């Protein structure tokens, strides 16, 4: 959807999202991805943080060569970059590597060193939200790996919705999957997984803001540990 989005475009996408949500309330991930492909053709993108390749594998089966968007913030673990490279070589996909306007060094020079510590919300905005917004402008829909079991903030995540924040249809294809569902798929299909998962990191983001979960906490309790912040701003709607 490389165009200037009109109000008519947005209304049409909203209506499509509403119909899809009503018709596919109990749909499987495969059904959701087929619906996405039937309605948007090649005009959608799959987002991945390279924690694992489950969603990537599912999407590639529906549309070989599908665009897979990866936000290269400049702060990722080496293991995450390695997983991205491995995923790109193993699966029939096209990785769209999205970087912020500024390198980490340039950002440090402009706003001060280690913005992730002094203002994590602004750091996420500059290195994730702004680049994502620009990248999504060329698509009519995006597919995410957001799951309801990730954290209380995601417990009611819809399968299909209109993303008001970014102006396109959003499909959370594996929103209903449990941790057991994920592991079963990985075991049965030999799906690539970020090695940090086996080291005790069930939710992986930028290295400075990712720790192992707190005792008794949800998978995302290791993100921005000690702060009230629980989301980076990508899933505001």
From Swiss-Prot:
Question: Which keywords label this protein?
Answer: Cytoplasm, Iron, Iron-sulfur, Metal-binding, Oxidoreductase
Q: Which GO terms describe its cellular component?
A: cytoplasm
- List required co-factors: [4Fe-4S] cluster
Q: Name one Pfam family in it.
A: PAPS_reduct
Subcellular location(s): the record lists: Cytoplasm
- Listed InterPro entries: APS_reductase, PAPS/APS_Rdtase, PAPS_reduct_dom, Rossmann-like_a/b/a_fold
Specify which residues bind [4Fe-4S] cluster according to the UniProt entry for this protein: 123-124, 206, 209
Q: Work out whether the entry's keyword set contains Transmembrane.
A: no
Give the pathway listed in the UniProt entry for this protein: Sulfur metabolism; hydrogen sulfide biosynthesis; sulfite from sulfate
Q: Name one GO biological process term.
A: sulfate assimilation, phosphoadenylyl sulfate reduction by phosphoadenylyl-sulfate reductase (thioredoxin)
Q: Which reaction does it catalyse?
A: [thioredoxin]-disulfide + sulfite + AMP + 2 H(+) = adenosine 5'-phosphosulfate + [thioredoxin]-dithiol
Tell me one GO molecular function of this protein: metal ion binding
Top enzyme class, one word, equals: oxidoreductase
Task: Provide the active-site residues from the annotation.
Answer: 232
* Superkingdom, taxonomy of origin: Bacteria
UniProt-listed Enzyme Commission number(s): 1.8.4.10
* HAMAP family tied to this protein: CysH
Q: Which PANTHER family match?
A: PHOSPHOADENOSINE PHOSPHOSULFATE REDUCTASE
Q: Which NCBIfam families match?
A: APS_reductase (TIGR02055), cysH (TIGR00434), PRK02090.1 (NF002537)
Q: Please report which protein family the annotation says this sequence is part of.
A: Belongs to the PAPS reductase family. CysH subfamily.
Describe the task this protein carries out: Catalyzes the formation of sulfite from adenosine 5'-phosphosulfate (APS) using thioredoxin as an electron donor.
Name assigned to this protein:
Adenosine 5'-phosphosulfate reductase
Q: Which organism is it from?
A: Mycobacteroides abscessus (strain ATCC 19977 / DSM 44196 / CCUG 20993 / CIP 104536 / JCM 13569 / NCTC 13031 / TMC 1543 / L948)
Taxon lineage: Bacteria, Bacillati, Actinomycetota, Actinomycetes, Mycobacteriales
